[in-house]
Amino acid sequence: VDHPEMVLGNLELESTQYGHDLTVAPIEGAVLADQLAEEMKALGVSDVRVEDKCYVYGKIPATKGYEGKTKLGFIAHMDTVSDYCDHDIIPVVHKNYDGGDLPLGTSGRTLTVKDFPHLPSLAGRTLITTDGTTVLGADDKAGVAEIMTMAEALIKENIPHGPISIAFTPDEEVGGGTDHFNVEKFGAQFAY
């Protein structure tokens, strides 16, 4: 994680869908949508807007000479699962992780190398986990963080690229994430 502060701020905001009523945009989702829009603007993303039902859109124009390249899109959903302790999320940052068993705060829960044999391959990296008392919300706030990090790199490092569209959607966890997605305004030929 290059920007744990960005991830942490977004993880701490509650963004679960209220029940299964897709006609209601949750207040917390609106807060996260507005926060992401402001972060996108600060990074230099253009045409940033929050549309009805908390859909967030933005564009990164092509660099000079790449305007005719394929229009790519990147999409992640903002809502998180609400089946298990989704309030008062306490993310824990493990800097320079040692590759061993990973205690989840003071909850008594531990991610063990025995149960997760890939853990040693992450030694030396910064990991973000829950404190063990709530879900982390990394599905798909980690995707949001990756897209924001990509946007920052493309813009600040002036990496050549074609037109890029970005979208953050609500309601994926309850099956409504694309119900009001504006494909035409999104404008990508292909999206990930």
Spans of model-derived segments:
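Acidic/His- and Gly-rich active-site-bordering loop/insert found
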Residues: 2-126
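Acidic/histidine-rich catalytic neighborhood of metal-dependent amide-processing enzymes
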Residues: 120-192
